[in-house]
């Protein structure tokens, strides 16, 4: 069977003619190849996580509970009170023991301890009198100091209403000028400014101090009603802490004369309540008493000539 001659299409014939000439001139020919697909940005593989996804996998979301645990910090225990370096160990122990029963600052408590040592060391006769005792912590400090010195026969007098503060007067302003009455009205009677403590509470606190009960005298009522009638004739330490002008003036007028020579006067609120300061300054001006009032933070201390 004879083959039929191959008939080329015109495009193919044209291409062959061109390739023949191109081959002779350059050694190259034109070849038809597959047309490449247009280049586009690679599409993400659905089976593989994206970069953001990988980041999410590497950093899982923090659970709310874990986040809360991460920011909660333990509350450190309240450190014990720090005392100046010159406070002796015995005084520090006394101050720590009475802390729950007093609002008196460490400096003023330490001054009371030193005053108590002073009257024992120098045989100063008389009782220890405190006007305004709150829960009795300051007088507890005195009693503990007496016990540490082996003295148990000195009378202790605690004058107080045992119902809280008495009404202030116009003279009674805080050091910043605010009225004491305004401050009292703004706070409930359970707040420290009212200084409410019952007689039973004070006695309960003293039960932990082995000082002879018959030597501890609780005098209940306003000092204007109980002083001088129920006060001792001789006083070795006179501590005034009733805050207000009228009560402080009354105490100085009726008790300072009973403070013996060499005895110690402690005024707790001289630098805090203007009425207390005014009462003291007026008394010293009126009597001409030459007292050097030494600062014990907001209080004052003096030894009677």
Q: What kind of region is each of these model predictions?
A:
Residues 1-89:
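Membrane-proximal basic amphipathic "stem/tether" segments
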Residues 107-111:
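N-terminal pre-P-loop "Q-motif" helix
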Residues 114:
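Conserved pre-motif I regulatory segment
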Residues 80-106, 117, 122-305:
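S-adenosylmethionine/decaboxylated-SAM
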């Amino acid at each position: 069977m004879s083959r039929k001659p191959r008939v080329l299409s015109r495009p193919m014939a044209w291409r062959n003619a061109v390739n023949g000439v191109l081959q002779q001139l350059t050694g190259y020919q034109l070849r038809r190849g597959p047309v490449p697909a247009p280049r586009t940005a690679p599409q993400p593989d659905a089976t593989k996580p994206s970069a953001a996804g990988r980041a999410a996998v590497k950093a899982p979301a923090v659970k709310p509970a874990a986040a809360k645990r991460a920011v909660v910090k333990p509350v450190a225990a309240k450190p014990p009170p720090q005392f100046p370096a010159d406070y002796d160990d015995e005084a520090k122990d006394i101050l720590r023991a009475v802390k729950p029963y007093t609002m008196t600052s460490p400096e003023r408590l330490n001054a009371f301890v030193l005053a108590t040592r002073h009257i024992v060391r120098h045989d100063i006769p008389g009782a220890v009198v405190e006007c305004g005792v709150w829960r009795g912590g300051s007088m507890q400090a005195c009693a503990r100091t007496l016990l540490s010195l082996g003295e148990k026969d000195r009378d202790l007098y605690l004058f107080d209403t045992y119902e809280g503060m008495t009404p202030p007067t116009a003279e009674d302003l805080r050091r910043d000028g605010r009225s004491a009455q305004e401050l009292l009205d703004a706070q409930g009677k359970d707040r420290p400014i009212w200084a409410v403590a019952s007689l039973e509470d004070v006695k309960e606190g003293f039960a932990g101090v082995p000082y002879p009960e018959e030597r501890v005298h609780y005098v209940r009522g306003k000092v204007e009603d109980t002083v001088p009638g129920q006060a001792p004739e001789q006083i070795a330490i006179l501590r005034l802490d009733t805050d207000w002008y009228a009560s402080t003036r009354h105490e100085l007028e009726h008790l300072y004369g009973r403070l013996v020579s060499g005895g110690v006067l402690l005024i707790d609120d001289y630098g805090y309540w203007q009425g207390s300061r005014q009462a003291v300054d007026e008394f010293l001006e009126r009597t001409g008493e030459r007292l050097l009032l030494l600062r014990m933070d907001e209080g004052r201390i003096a030894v009677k000539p």
